[in-house]
């Protein structure tokens, strides 16, 4: 998925608004994903999946950090997330569809907290970005 210059600007703009809330939004994204797509819980059998659990917050922080890393290296997402791609493909063996679920839930969280920022154009750019992140994380499955 190729991000245009406008897409990159839109994505960076959204993440600048997210600012210090990235970890909170990461946890909220996971909670939403576990409720909307309960099959995703199978990868977290050892987690307390209750609202506000320390484990969800900690993993949400990791998710947020990976997304921020991807934004910071938006011209080389594959390089920025290479180790994470290896982990998910070779060790964790996460079903690739789960990255789509995560991306969708992240878009919902952004829409809830920043409805004015999520214009149709920004929505499309953020969706393309999340698809690009998902593609990178599943690229080494082959």
UniProtKB/Swiss-Prot annotation:
GO molecular function, one term: organic acid binding
GO BP annotations, alphabetical order: hydrogen peroxide catabolic process
Function, as annotated: Involved in oxygen transport from the lung to the various peripheral tissues.
Higher taxonomy: Eukaryota, Metazoa, Chordata, Craniata, Vertebrata
Expressed in which tissues: Red blood cells.
Keyword check for Iron: yes
Chain residues that bind O2: 59
Subunit structure and binding partners: Heterotetramer of two alpha chains and two beta chains.
Keywords, alphabetical: Heme, Iron, Metal-binding, Oxygen transport, Transport
The species this protein was found in: Cairina moschata
Globin domain mapped to chain residues: 2-142
Name used for this protein in its record: Hemoglobin subunit alpha-A
Binding site for heme b: 88
């Amino acid at each position: 998925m190729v991000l245009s210059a406008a897409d990159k600007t839109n994505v960076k703009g959204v993440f600048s608004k997210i600012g210090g809330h990235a970890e909170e939004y990461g946890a909220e994204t996971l909670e939403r994903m576990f409720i909307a797509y309960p099959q995703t819980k199978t990868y977290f059998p050892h987690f307390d999946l209750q609202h506000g659990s320390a484990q969800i917050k900690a993993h949400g922080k990791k998710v947020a950090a990976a997304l921020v890393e991807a934004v910071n290296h938006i011209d080389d997402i594959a390089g920025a997330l290479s180790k994470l791609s290896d982990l998910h493909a070779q060790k964790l063996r996460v079903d690739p569809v789960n990255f789509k679920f995560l991306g969708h839930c992240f878009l919902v969280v952004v829409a809830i907290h920043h409805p004015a920022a999520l214009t149709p154009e920004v929505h499309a750019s953020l969706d393309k970005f999340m698809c690009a992140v998902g593609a990178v994380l599943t690229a080494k499955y082959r």
